[in-house]
Amino acid sequence: MSYVPHVPYVPTPEKVVRRMLEIAKVSQDDIVYDLGCGDGRIIITAAKDFNVKKAVGVEINDERIREALANIEKNGVTGRASIVKGNFFEVDISEATVVTMFLLTNVNEMLKPKLEKELKPGTRVVSHEFEIRGWNPKEVIKVEDGNMNHTVYLYVIGEHK
């Protein structure tokens, strides 16, 4: 069994979700993976509003999985959005063209070898709030949401070092 990260569940605000997908220029040709998908909001938005080919959430928490599956059904994207139950360190993400995450800097650090090994050149990696140390972001944006300022980092595999 590999490392099981403890990342507190904090939902990404809807405005930030949209900007994360926009900064990655998500389109109908993309396969989006959200690592630690929580209630499924990123994959649902990717499927519903960006019409992606496929959106996959990876989640380990049973309560969050139930919530995400209910939200997928409620939003009518059952055919294009799905949940994989598991530890994102162990789930194969090699088909992804976009990976989104709202984890912690130390977890991002531990994920670097997996991302570099499994993702193809050109795959976009979007991190909400926490950078991936040692990688050069292609773009960094600030997103205001109420009285909170959020930072979104875009990395592109093959251009990240």
From Swiss-Prot:
Per the Swiss-Prot or TrEMBL record, what residue ranges does the short sequence motif DxGxGxG SAM-binding motif cover? 34-40
Q: How does activity depend on temperature?
A: Optimum temperature is about 60 degrees Celsius. Is active over a wide temperature range, from 25 to 90 degrees Celsius. Has half-lives of about 30 and 10 minutes at 80 and 90 degrees Celsius, respectively.
Query: GO MF terms on file?
Result: protein-lysine N-methyltransferase activity
Catalytic activity line of the entry = L-lysyl-[protein] + S-adenosyl-L-methionine = N(6)-methyl-L-lysyl-[protein] + S-adenosyl-L-homocysteine + H(+)
- Looking at its record, which EC class is this enzyme? transferase
This protein's source sits in the domain of life called Archaea
- Stated consequence of mutating residue 34 to K: Almost complete loss of catalytic activity
Entry EC no(s): 2.1.1.-
Kindly state a single biological-process term from the GO annotations of this entry: methylation
Q: What keywords were assigned to this record? A: Methyltransferase, S-adenosyl-L-methionine, Transferase
Q: Does the keyword S-adenosyl-L-methionine apply?
A: yes
Q: Answer yes or no on keyword Transferase.
A: yes
Q: What induces it?
A: Seems to be expressed at similar protein levels when grown at 75 or 85 degrees Celsius, or in the exponential or the stationary phase.
Effect caused by changing residue 11 to A: 23% of wild-type catalytic activity
Consequence of mutating residue 9 to A? 11% of wild-type catalytic activity
Q: Which family does it belong to?
A: Belongs to the class I-like SAM-binding methyltransferase superfamily.
Assembly and partners? Monomer.
Q: What does this protein do?
A: Catalyzes the methylation of lysine residues in target proteins, using S-adenosyl-L-methionine (SAM) as the methyl donor. Exhibits broad substrate specificity, being able to methylate the crenarchaeal chromatin protein Cren7 primarily at 'Lys-11', 'Lys-16' and 'Lys-31', as well as a number of recombinant Sulfolobus proteins in vitro. Methylates lysine residues in a rather sequence-independent manner.
Task: Please identify the protein, giving its name as recorded.
Answer: Protein-lysine N-methyltransferase
